[in-house]
Curated annotation (Swiss-Prot):
The lineage of its organism: Bacteria, Pseudomonadati, Pseudomonadota, Alphaproteobacteria, Sphingomonadales. PANTHER family: 10 KDA HEAT SHOCK PROTEIN, CO-CHAPERONIN GROES. Keywords: Chaperone, Cytoplasm. It is found in: Cytoplasm. Heptamer of 7 subunits arranged in a ring. Interacts with the chaperonin GroEL. It comes from Zymomonas mobilis subsp. mobilis (strain ATCC 31821 / ZM4 / CP4). GO terms for cellular component: cytoplasm. One of its GO terms (biological process) is chaperone cofactor-dependent protein refolding. One of its GO terms (molecular function) is unfolded protein binding. This is Co-chaperonin GroES.
Length: 95
């Protein structure tokens, strides 16, 4: 992939939504919500503090993250639909 986010931006691939509920009910495509969970594909170098130093991001490529329902901007990179968002849009890292 030839894309590198700048500053505090993060490139995220959504994970596939569940096909069935815990009770075994199959969810049709029309009823599925966009997942709010994804994998970090690439991350910027970080933000600049007031004294000019780079503050690195807490997330890195490979992290599984949760983000807000309306977070990020959809982009198409190498034929794949991805999200680019600020690190502050990420709610947490799933371990």
């Amino acid at each position: 992939m030839n894309f590198r986010p700048l500053h505090d931006r993060v490139l995220v691939r959504r994970v596939a939504a569940e096909e069935k509920t815990a009770g075994g009910i199959i969810i049709p495509d029309t009823a599925k919500e966009k997942p709010q969970e994804g994998e970090v594909i690439a991350a910027g170098n970080g933000t600049h503090s007031e004294d000019g130093k780079v503050v690195p991001l807490d997330v890195k490529a490979g992290d599984r993250v949760l983000f807000g329902k309306w977070s990020g901007t959809e982009v198409r990179v190498d034929g794949e639909d991805l999200l680019i968002m600020k690190e502050s849009d990420i709610l947490g890292i799933i371990s």
